[in-house]
Amino acid sequence: MSSAPTPPFAPLAPLAPASRVAIFGAGLLGRLLAGSLARQGHRVELFDAASEDGDGAAARVAAAMLAPLAESAVTEPNVVAMGLYALERWPQLLATLPQPVYFQRNGTLIVWHRQDAPDAARLQALLERNQRQVAGLPALQVLDSAGVAHAEPALAQRFAHGLLLPGEGQLDNRQLFRALAEQLHSAGVHMHWHSPRQPSDFTPGEPGQPDWVLDCRGLGAQPQWQTLRGVRGEVIRLHAPQVTLARPTRLVHPRYSIYIAPKEDHLFVIGATEIESNDTSPVSVRSTLELLSAAYTVHTGFAEARVVEMNTQCRPTLPDNLPAIRRCAPRVLQLNGLYRHGFMIAPAVHDAALELLLQGQSPLAARLNLAVQDV
């Protein structure tokens, strides 16, 4: 369970107009913050150890699902609240981009095979309890075979029961990264690729130095934030022209919940595995067999799919599995710990950080119980 929130910062002087801001880490948070600050007229420099493609970012591998009710089974109420916030905030953020990014809110479908019905019953009870406890979560819909077929015609006669979680969504993370890169170019952000940095490289506020430093490096910040750890995820991308799904589908499994997230043009992102490890070696044979076998049991059309990618990445995770913002020096903010919920909670962390910079305090962080602390 989460600990009590750390008291918010003492009020800080708002960021002056046309301030110079250095951002470390061009993953999801770093790009979002760079774009927002540049649009407000600040002079932004973005540093990253990898390339513009974001090949070192956990967010590039993710399925980018926005599923607060589904994730309530494995996370805390404040993360669920951040997920509800993100569902409304993402369309506003996407509207600022120079090119369209796939986004939909068709809900989440949960299905299971007959032998896994007891696990599904426990999951249903847990989700129903969470829905009653967290304001704003929609009531799930219990489906029979006809209901599953109506929700996903491609799964007709494949599952006797299912659960539909209305209003949940997803976006295309690869399209988003490209659109953010174009936005940053257009906004005049100075981007430094293959240029690792750490807070000690600058003295913010001194002549010739940035006014603020924002550290969004994920696991790259481990030397300065030693409680960070990596949680390995393994994901397979398939092109399956014979399969059409309208929404992310989760398969109840005795060991883990497998998800199938459909993107445009019959591209599917399949994942589930979560391993306590900093290991970024290629996907294991066991995970490959389990993920592909599970996909085939959901829809036999995956048998003729083509494997486009098999990826691994480690998500930056704090001991309580919750995100945090901390000030490690008078003008240095560190943002980290998005764990497996990156896209679902990034808008809240992004907006809270902007409030801290522009107002000196964050009512949003207090409302969402997002940890903000001095160290």
Can you annotate each of these PLM segments?
Residues 22-24, 209-219, 350:
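Short hydrophobic core segments
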Residues 32-40, 65-66, 101-104, 217-330:
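Active-site substrate-recognition segment that forms the wall
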Residues 99-113, 129, 136-181, 273-277, ...:
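Helix-loop-beta segment of a Rossmann-like dinucleotide-binding subdomain
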Residues 63-147, 151:
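Dinucleotide-binding Rossmann-like beta1-alpha1 core, especially the glycine-rich loop
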Residues 20-45:
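N-terminal Rossmann-like FAD-binding beta1-loop-alpha1 element of flavoenzymes
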Residues 305-375:
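C-terminal catalytic lobe of FAD-dependent flavoproteins
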Residues 162-212, 216:
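Helical element adjacent to the flavin cofactor pocket in flavoenzyme catalytic cores
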Residues 39-59:
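Glycine-rich FAD pyrophosphate-binding loop
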